[in-house]
Regions:
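Interdomain hinge/lid region at the active-site interface
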Residues: 49-119
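A short hydrophobic/aromatic micro-motif that marks alpha-helical segments and, especially, helix-coil
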Residues: 35, 97-98, 122-124
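Internal alpha-helical scaffold of NAD(P)-dependent oxidoreductase catalytic cores
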Residues: 1-66
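Long, positively charged, glycine-interspersed low-complexity recognition regions
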Residues: 124-130
C-alpha cells in the first residue's frame, strides 16, 4: 500500500537492501550535508565579520550551505549510524578536493576545465535517466 501511495505522488522508487541503501545514501545525501555544514564552518571561522558574509555571499553560497541549516539533533545520530560508509565517502571526497587543489596550485587550467566539464554531466543525471 505504501508503494502505491508513493507512485500516486509520482515519486521515484528504487528497491535495495539496507546495506546498499546506507552505502549509496552516504554519497548522495550524507556527504552533501557534511559538505554544507563544513563549508559554513570554514567561512564562519575565516570571516569573523558576519556583515562581510552577508554582503558578499551570493545565491551560489546560499544554496550550497542550505543543508547546513539542518537539525544537528537529527543529523548527528544519522552520521554516527552510517559512520563506516560516511568515512569511505569522505575519504573519496577529500581525495577529489586534494586533486582539484593540486590543479589550481599547478595552474593546470586544461585539466581543471576538463574535470569540471566531466562533472557537468551530473545535471543530466539529476534530470533523470530515461
Amino acid at each position: 500500500i505504501a508503494k502505491e501511495l508513493f507512485l500516486s505522488m509520482e515519486m521515484h522508487i528504487k528497491e535495495m537492501n539496507a546495506d546498499e541503501h546506507d552505502k549509496h545514501i552516504a554519497y548522495v545525501s550524507h556527504l552533501s550535508h557534511i559538505t554544507s555544514f563544513m563549508l559554513g564552518r570554514t567561512v564562519m571561522d575565516k570571516e569573523k565579520n558576519e556583515e562581510t558574509i552577508y554582503d558578499l555571499a551570493g545565491s551560489g553560497f546560499e544554496s550550497t550551505v542550505r543543508l547546513g541549516k539542518s537539525s544537528p539533533s537529527m543529523w548527528a545520530p544519522i552520521f554516527q549510524q552510517n559512520k563506516k560508509n560516511i568515512i569511505e565517502a569522505l575519504d573519496e571526497y577529500i581525495k577529489n578536493i586534494k586533486n582539484f587543489k593540486d590543479l589550481i596550485e599547478t595552474d593546470n587550467l586544461l585539466e581543471m576545465s576538463k574535470e569540471m566539464k566531466e562533472i557537468n554531466a551530473i545535471k543530466n543525471i539529476l534530470k533523470g535517466i530515461k
